[in-house]
Every structure is written in C-alpha cells, then in structure tokens.
Amino acid sequence: MTLKLGVNIDHVATLRNARKEAFPDPLDAAAICLAAGADFIVVHLRKDQRHIELKDVAQLCKWFPKKIHVECAATDFAQKAVLKYKPHSVCIVPEVPGEVTTTGGLKFTPAVEKRIFAMIEKLHKKHILVSLFVDPVPADLSAAARL
C-alpha cells in the first residue's frame, strides 16, 4: 500500500466565511495543494455549512474529479449532496449540533447501523468509496466491519 497525502481545506472556507467575502477561495486552495503534490483534498460538509458549503463541494468535485474526499454525517442533507456531486470518497462521521470539531467515532445503535448501511449501499452504487470514522474499540470496530 502506498501512503497518500490528503490536505483538509476546511479552514480556508472558515476564513472566507468569517470575512464575508469570496476569498480565500477553497477551489484555489485545492488547486495549490494538488499542484504541490497532495494526492487528494479533504472537506467536511456539515449541516450548518459553517465552513465548507454545498457550492464548494459542487465546484471541487467538478474541477477535481477523483481527488475529493468528503467527511459527512449520515443525514439526508449530506447524503443528497454526495450522491449529487459524487466525490471520489466519503467518510461517514458523527455530527453533534454545536460541536467545535469531531471528538469521537460513530455511536453504533441498530438504528444508526441501518441508516449507515443504507447510505453505504447508495454510495457504492455511484462508485463512491466509503470509510467510517470509528473509535478504536472492539465493539465499534466489529460494528463497522458488519457494515
């Protein structure tokens, strides 16, 4: 297996949004990172779109096909977005309203597993690679493996 470099550009969008301007542009940041040798670009699409926005995901996937990795929750909002814009890969992560950053892995319950399984099936039908953000504990690893 070859090690690959992914660069997260979320905070380029955070700065843009704080300025209430069109710059810095995450699309420009992605181009610079890829030109400098990054293998792929990572963005976290949250429901509140506090940094990366739907328009960013759309543009990134359009201009850099096969180079975009989206982190998102197993929500209708995120699922519709990734099925529409078709990034190369998706990591399903937990999302807690008001959290500053993701602090732990998915919490597996039967309902969560069912929802994630359904999302994985839909993503695979669009040839989108899927990973899960899990805590390194046996029960969570087993749950992820079942999916």
Annotated model-derived regions:
Residues 77-79, 84-147:
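Conserved anion-binding
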Residues 1-77, 83-87, 143-146:
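Conserved N-terminal beta1-alpha1 strand-loop-helix module at the mouth
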